[in-house]
Amino acid sequence: MNVLILGSGQLARMMSLASAPLNIDVIAYDVNSQQIVHPLTQQPIDLSLEQAIKQVDVITAEFEHIPHHILDICSVSGKFQPTPDAIKAGGDRRLEKKLLDNAHVANAKYHNINTKQDFLNAIDTVGIPMVLKSALGGYDGKGQWRLKDVSQVDSIWEEMDELIKSSPNQAIVAEQFIPFNREVSLIGARNKNGQMVTYPLTENVHVDGVLALSTALEGTSNLQQQADEMFTAIADELNYIGVLAIEFFDVDGTLLVNEIAPRVHNSGHWTQQGTDICQFEMHIRAVCNLPLTGNQLLRSTAMINILGEDSLPDEILTMPNCHIHWYGKEKRAGRKMGHINVCADSPEMLQKELSKLANILDKQAFKALS
């Protein structure tokens, strides 16, 4: 079987690595260069997008910001999974909010903003404090503002207005500020037959708006049930096929959906060592309509993002429960260069392993371990 992935970054890379044992060949479409490339080497392949579409059995995506005309070309083939509507909802907060409402899942109050009057109306609808997010293109904390007081309206509007005017169809979504206890996420999958599986919830720690540490949760049956039910509602609403990630706010034991990602997700990288079938293989299984299994937690596991670093002390390689995954990317400040998965026999032992790691790694570069 042959699969074409739209996007050629680290997620496509890891999906390709997970596909090989299944005897599934993967090629990728680099959205920037508009070339078909090998997902591991990035070497161009002498195929046009149209030729690649004809050659493969399945088309999928590694991220949601795919140009709509590319989605449309792939959709016409009947091979694209999940649906273009799912990808578009993941890339546009307005569509995402509408989806959550249609699926009847709990999320923060919101108001769409295109003009300053909309902004003022949002204050009445949503209230202060509020979080303001770009409808298109925002990620890792970018394109966001927090309104704490009416005195900030003019200065924040000036920045938002500039963003709205910077690209067609851009807007702002105002959301009620949610004072949450922690952020958690759920990775799940659904295939064409409607079979669904979910992984254990993950607790996430962000530093400067970027995911830094994810830990698989154990013994959270009530939260897990809430998350599973919301996953089912959203996946069914979309008639979803593939891996779907949902980020939640945990508010005193009640979950509210923050956002969705219609793809494999950074907070699910721990599944490479923590489960039998990682999220990357699970996505390939789902889009190829293969059985979904192996989602149970095998051992206590956490993932640490490597941000802006292209080397680590060799001492880490002496730790048998540590697994480094590099992405083969050029070093850049704050860039996701790779991740480390850490495993242990219990949550207590995992914390000891993370403490060992904290003593080895640079404390400024890995603040979440401090």
From Swiss-Prot:
Pathway entry: Purine metabolism; IMP biosynthesis via de novo pathway; 5-amino-1-(5-phospho-D-ribosyl)imidazole-4-carboxylate from 5-amino-1-(5-phospho-D-ribosyl)imidazole (N5-CAIR route): step 1/2
Any single GO CC term annotated in Swiss-Prot or TrEMBL for this entry: cytosol
Binding site for ATP: 93, 133, 138-144, 175-178, 183, 206, 258-259
Reactions that this protein is recorded to catalyse: 5-amino-1-(5-phospho-beta-D-ribosyl)imidazole + hydrogencarbonate + ATP = 5-carboxyamino-1-(5-phospho-D-ribosyl)imidazole + ADP + phosphate + 2 H(+)
PROSITE patterns associated with the record: ATP_GRASP
GO molecular function: 5-(carboxyamino)imidazole ribonucleotide synthase activity; ATP binding; metal ion binding; phosphoribosylaminoimidazole carboxylase activity
A Pfam short name: RS_preATP-grasp-like
InterPro entries (alphabetical): ATP-grasp, ATP-grasp_carboxylate-amine, ATP_grasp_subdomain_1, PreATP-grasp_dom_sf, PurK, PurK_C, PurT/PurK_preATP-grasp, Rudment_hybrid_motif
GO terms, biological process: 'de novo' IMP biosynthetic process
All copies of domain ATP-grasp, residue ranges: 97-288
NCBIfam families from the UniProt entry: PRK06019.1-5 (NF004679), purK (TIGR01161)
HAMAP family, per database record: PurK
Family: Belongs to the PurK/PurT family.
Designated name of the protein: N5-carboxyaminoimidazole ribonucleotide synthase
Species this chain originates from: Aliivibrio fischeri (strain ATCC 700601 / ES114) (Vibrio fischeri)
